[in-house]
Amino acid sequence: MRSCRPAKGYFSPHPLPAKLVRGMICGMLDPFDPDRFIVRAEVHILGIEPKISRTLELPITLNLAQLHEVLQAAFGWTDSHLHQFNIGGLVYGAPEFDEDGLSDSRTFEATEVRMIDLQFPYDPEENPLTILYEYDFGDNWRHLLRLERVARQEGVKYPRCLAGKRSGPPEDVGGTSGYADFLDAWLDPDHEEHKAMRRWVGRKFHPEACNLDEINKAIGKALRASKGDYRFRRESHRD
């Protein structure tokens, strides 16, 4: 007889009642089955209009360190700065970057939390599951992820970027206000900084471009290099 116990490793700072959890597990589709479900993430960078966004589909076994690699590739970041995830008031990332305890919150290990460990609501429209991903604490890029569990499609390779709008900002541009100033100069041929900004980002950059093929290639490359952990850790071990 099939067990109705919650899946091993189920994580939630606010657990569901046992009766509801049993109902989820004992339905026609097991919501913890990685062969049946994936996570769809609608992601956009806060403070920028029109929105810079990506629709990502992720294996439910993906951990937060791997999610970091996916987000870096999806938005064209170069992983040159610190980052963290904020989930329900808890901070996840690479604890070794806060060994002096200077952060306001303790940083928990990102590799120890997977998508499958998160508590997905019954009604994502009424009560969506959201994660805040922060990158570059100087420029303060804040990405809001809205997550929902959806059925896995046969023959599809995950993770993947399904849709997107606009190019990610250049690194070290100065946050949302700096990016607005940059675009003013980049778009206006009469601006005194126009040529300098065009040279700085190169010919391939266009603020309205979003090449899904290139993004998905970058995602695949990043995950192959990370092998379940942060790439910077693996690279430092090779050194």
Segments predicted by a language model, with ranges:
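Short linear regulatory motifs enriched in tryptophan with gly/pro/ser
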Residues: 2, 9-239
